[in-house]
Amino acid sequence: MTVNTSSGGQITGWGIALGNNLITNHDLASRMDTSDEWIKERTGISERRIGGTTAGLAVQAAKDALKIADCSPDEIDLLVLATTTPDDQIPATSAMVQHLLGLKCGAMDLNAACSGFVYSLVTGFGM
């Protein structure tokens, strides 16, 4: 999938990463006064995955995105990492991701909660 914008920016790859530990509603119900049905009815959630660091998950997803885009790290102009759960406040998690991916471009964290993805796109396309 390629999305073109008037600024010339494109989305040419994407990636995903999930924590290794699976916690189901049944797991939660065995430890607290709730049930799978009660949680699903109110949230639509049946399971969640936890584990891993933000940087580790970001690197895993970024490697997938680079592969799908048939792109090398030296072709990246800017790394914008949208998160509300950084590994540390200082240094920015994006700096660790930048290092682990071998990127030579600038890198920045962006904390905008649920709208972080949209703000990251606008920031990247605006550069």
Predicted stretch roles:
Residues 1-78, 99-101:
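Conserved "HGTGT" condensation-loop signature of ketosynthase/thiolase-family condensing enzymes
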Residues 38-42, 46-56, 83-127:
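Conserved catalytic cysteine-centered active-site region
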